[in-house]
From Swiss-Prot:
Family as reported in the entry's similarity comment: Belongs to the IPP transferase family.
Cofactor(s) required for function per UniProt: Mg(2+)
InterPro entries for the chain: Dimethylallyltransferase, IPT, P-loop_NTPase
Subunit field text: Monomer.
Organism: Clostridium botulinum (strain Kyoto / Type A2)
Name of this chain's protein: tRNA dimethylallyltransferase
UniProt catalytic activity: adenosine(37) in tRNA + dimethylallyl diphosphate = N(6)-dimethylallyladenosine(37) in tRNA + diphosphate
Assigned EC number: 2.5.1.75
Residue numbers spanned by region Interaction with substrate tRNA: 34-37
The UniProt record lists the keyword tRNA processing: yes
One of the GO biological process terms: tRNA modification
Positions marked as site (Interaction with substrate tRNA): T100
Annotated positions binding ATP: G9, P10, T11, A12, V13, G14, K15, T16
Amino acid sequence: MIDLLIIAGPTAVGKTDISIELAEKLNGEIISADSMQIYKYMDIGSAKITKDEMKGIPHHLIDVVEPHEEFNVSSFKALAEKSIKDIWNKGKLPIIVGGTGLYINSLIYNYDFTDADRDEKYREYLTKLAEDKGKEYVHSLLKDIDEESYEKLYPNDLKRVVRALEVYKITGKSISEYTKENEKKLYDIPYNVNYFILNMNREVLYERINKRVDIMMSKGLIEEVKKLESMGYTPDMQSMKGIGYKEVLFYLNGDISLDEAIYLIKKGSRNYAKRQLTWFRKDKRSIWIDKDKYSSEEEIVDKIIKMVKDK
């Protein structure tokens, strides 16, 4: 079984320095789990680690796709699993570092991202049926095959109604039966997981976020977005919808002032951090490290190493 160390946490909590020190002390290589740092040319707005900051530690899944290319959790899982095996086969420790919870979950849960349990044509048929005969009619189709879903779901919740019908068509099972079976497989993964969440006082974290945004602006975030625009990258692209990029685009298009853009970036980043913390609390395997309780980052690193070795 492959040992896997995960260092996660909200934006601006200070994952980078700790992960570098851990990699140095544990003979590891780092795999980024960040949905923005995968894009080339988007360095300032994503707070991408620099070559100097890497201190010679190999980093994976940074600068892997062009900003116009689609990249999703399935793409991440495939690339990350390959990197994990490559690092382990070199006799080194794979260390996942980042704040994109869905990316991390794709590795520590046995999610199936294939289309084995999907039927697009049937979905389209049901969606068209809802348009022609109404959502209530489509909902009524559940009554004889999945009474539990029929009672639990409302006709207006068409997406979930369609999913329940689709699952029954493909598997012959109710959505609840199907879900229970999949839950049993969820923890069937080839990794020995050590999962740490870095956290700190909320007010201090928000101050760090605000300061980080100011630093991004002084480093040239506006110029970075202008350059991306000149390269042909547009607001409708997934990459350009990231926090920091979309607000600067609004400013450059004359929709808002610069002060408003900065305010919105800070607000969006704080809200994102809040959502990240909510997400990370869902996993009972994670160990939370409150940075405020330690006098130095070196102390945190030593604590993590001790817990990993004692496990």
